[in-house]
């Protein structure tokens, strides 16, 4: 071409890998267009400050450095293109390209050259590699001599690149002469500070609009100086430094803690920040609720009156969490979520609970549930398949608590444990008002049915030992036990404690057969029944009392859920395990019963309900015989 050179199949290297396109070098500068359009890079010749040629595998690379510190790399030139393009650039731009050599020795020690926003690692005088500091998301000082750089890897993944540089670590010994330190500030710290000062050149190099010092952050844990810039948020700690673009801020949450002088401010991110191998989609900041600040923004009046009109004010005075949230909302444009209509029994905004092994608080919000502080877990209502209330066994140490299971449409489950029972009605009413599907005890239930079941549980929990004492005094010990077992259908487990399920979540109340339950009831109730006799009698009276307690073999008996399951599955167990010992059949049945599907448990419960009605009628007739009816029945039989 008379007015320049045109090259096809030239790739632009940088963030997101390489992008193929077309490059045109003309008298006014350089223009590169991506294949398919949408993206173009134009460099005016007046902005060029340096040009380099480098031999790379199978082609040549042209490097263009501009005044802003940016460095563009165009790859795909043939050997014969180098000479013609060099002479053209000399005549039109007045810059002679410099030839650089690539180190192929494989050595991993050398020197670092920091120029503009580029970090170049040199082995001797040859370049081993270079990275753009504009892509550095954060820096970490590991120990006294290692500095790790982590890159904006999520942006790379958005470009659908299978392989990308995520982090790189430099070892800076104390004997380093390029970055001289002292006892309090080793060379690695000097190198990290230099990187941090250069990583913000260009569009992100503006001064902080406002800085909040010494803020406690629970996730990722530490104390940080929080800097709010025009285009990004910065968390600067003693060992970690995070730079977060406002485009990554999805939503802000302002959530007061119940009965404590602190308030959570949560910054939800997409993509999340990364520390080592851990991702942090939520930054949890904790402010003192009553702390008042007076802040002035370092921002020009032109920006305040144009871009940030009705979004920011020149000065703010108020509670620190309110001031921080308002400024961050104005800069990022993210929406703020506050507590909704839910109130706990203590008029708070959350209920205490545990998630996995961590204690925290669960916030029922208008469109989501949020568990804080660790691990911060956000569950949107639209992602929920159903919720389930799970009670703890009556009479146990945890009888005053219940669990809340939230199952997502992706089949993932979140179990919030040890919620106080007096929070049930508030939670149930709130969840019902949101139209969320509620399941209880492993089966679909209507709202009123669930309420009735849980109310029964509450009644049972008032004084369960009183009913046991009454039944034992009446000589019918097994009746109350079977009724109690029906209420605990979902806590039912294997017929023996050797089933291997002792570590499951329901091990406190389940994984035991009815005879196993009878033993502690006898031990617990035996001293209570003869308590008054002990004052007037002796040990012989207690022995006589125990000898009198004999069961009538003709008394009606109820059938447990495990017995129903055993009747239907015993033959299948024998078929699946030929030659299995008789003592092992019960263990296998117990394992299968614990792992049986929701539908099968529902069928078992239906059979239990039917059997309970039968048992209730028979035991009523057994306890209250009617002589006339019995005589007439005998007459008819004899006849």
Swiss-Prot record:
Keywords: Chromosome, DNA damage, DNA repair, DNA replication, DNA-binding, Nucleus, Transcription, Transcription regulation. One of its GO terms (molecular function) is nucleosome binding. Residues 474-506 have a biased composition (Acidic residues). Residues 555-623 bind DNA. It comes from the Eukaryota. Residues 618-639 have a biased composition (Polar residues). It is found in: Nucleus; Chromosome. The keyword DNA damage applies. Belongs to the SSRP1 family. PANTHER family: FACT COMPLEX SUBUNIT SSRP1. Component of the FACT complex, a stable heterodimer of SPT16 and SSRP1. Component of the FACT complex, a general chromatin factor that acts to reorganize nucleosomes. The FACT complex is involved in multiple processes that require DNA as a template such as mRNA elongation, DNA replication and DNA repair. During transcription elongation the FACT complex acts as a histone chaperone that both destabilizes and restores nucleosomal structure. This is FACT complex subunit SSRP1. The lineage of its organism: Eukaryota, Viridiplantae, Streptophyta, Embryophyta, Tracheophyta.
């Amino acid at each position: 071409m008379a007015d320049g050179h045109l090259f096809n199949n030239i790739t632009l290297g940088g963030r997101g890998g390489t992008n193929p396109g077309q490059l045109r070098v003309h008298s006014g500068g350089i223009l590169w267009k991506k294949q398919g359009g949408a993206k173009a890079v134009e460099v005016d010749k007046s902005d060029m400050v340096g040009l380099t040629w480098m031999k790379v595998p199978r082609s040549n690379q042209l490097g263009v450095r501009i005044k802003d510190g940016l460095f563009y790399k165009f790859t795909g030139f043939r050997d014969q293109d180098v000479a013609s393009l060099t002479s053209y650039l000399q005549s039109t731009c007045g810059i002679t390209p410099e030839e650089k050599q690539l180190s192929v020795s494989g050595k991993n020690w050398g020197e670092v050259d920091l120029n503009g926003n580029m970090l170049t690692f040199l082995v001797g005088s040859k370049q081993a590699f270079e990275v753009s500091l504009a892509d550095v998301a954060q820096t970490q000082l590991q120990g006294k001599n290692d500095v790790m750089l982590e890159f904006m890897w999520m942006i790379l993944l958005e470009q659908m690149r299978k392989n990308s540089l995520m982090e790189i670590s430099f070892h800076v010994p104390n004997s380093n002469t390029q970055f001289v330190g002292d006892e309090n500030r080793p060379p690695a710290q000097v190198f990290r500070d230099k990187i941090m000062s250069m990583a913000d050149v260009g569009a992100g190099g503006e001064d902080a609009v406002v800085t909040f010092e010494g803020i406690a952050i629970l996730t990722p844990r530490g104390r940080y100086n929080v800097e709010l810039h025009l285009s990004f948020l910065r968390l600067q700690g003693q060992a970690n430094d995070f730079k977060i673009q406002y485009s990554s801020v999805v939503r802000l949450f302002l959530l007061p803690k119940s009965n404590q002088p602190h308030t959570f401010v949560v910054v939800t991110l997409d993509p999340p920040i990364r520390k080592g191998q851990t991702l942090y989609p939520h930054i949890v900041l904790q402010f003192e609720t009553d702390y008042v600040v007076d802040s002035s923004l370092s921002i020009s009046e032109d920006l305040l009156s144009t871009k940030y009109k009705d979004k920011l004010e020149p000065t703010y005075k108020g509670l620190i969490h309110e001031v921080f949230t308002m400024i961050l909302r104005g800069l990022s444009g993210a929406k703020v979520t506050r507590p909704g209509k839910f109130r706990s029994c203590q008029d708070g905004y959350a209920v205490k609970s545990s998630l996995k092994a961590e204690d925290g608080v669960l916030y029922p919000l208008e469109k989501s549930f949020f568990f804080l502080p660790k691990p911060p877990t956000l569950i949107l209502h639209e992602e929920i398949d159903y919720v389930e209330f799970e009670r703890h066994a009556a009479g146990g140490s945890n009888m005053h608590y219940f669990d809340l299971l939230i199952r997502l449409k992706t089949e993932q489950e979140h179990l919030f444990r040890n919620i106080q029972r007096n929070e049930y009605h508030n939670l149930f009413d709130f969840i019902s008002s949101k139209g969320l599907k509620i399941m209880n005890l492993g089966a679909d239930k209507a709202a009123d049915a669930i309420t009735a079941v849980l109310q029964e549980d509450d009644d049972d929990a008032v004084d369960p030992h009183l009913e046991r004492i009454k039944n034992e005094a009446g000589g019918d010990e097994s009746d109350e036990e079977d009724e109690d077992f029906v209420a605990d259908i979902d806590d039912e487990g294997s017929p023996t404690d050797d089933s291997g399920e002792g570590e499951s979540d329901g091990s406190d109340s389940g994984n035991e057969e009815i005879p196993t339950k009878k033993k502690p009831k006898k031990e617990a109730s035996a001293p209570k029944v003869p308590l008054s006799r002990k004052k007037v009698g002796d040990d012989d009276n207690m022995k006589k009392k125990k000898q009198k307690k004999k069961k009538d073999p003709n008394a009606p008996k109820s059938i447990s859920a495990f017995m129903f399951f055993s009747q239907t599955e015993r033959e299948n167990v024998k078929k699946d395990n030929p030659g299995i010992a008789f003592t092992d059949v019960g263990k296998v049945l117990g394992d299968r019963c614990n792992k049986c599907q929701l539908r099968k448990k529902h069928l078992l419960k239906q059979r239990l309900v039917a059997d309970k009605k039968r048992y209730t009628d028979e035991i009523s007739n057994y306890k209250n015989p009617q002589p006339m009816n019995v005589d007439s029945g005998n007459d008819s039989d004899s006849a």
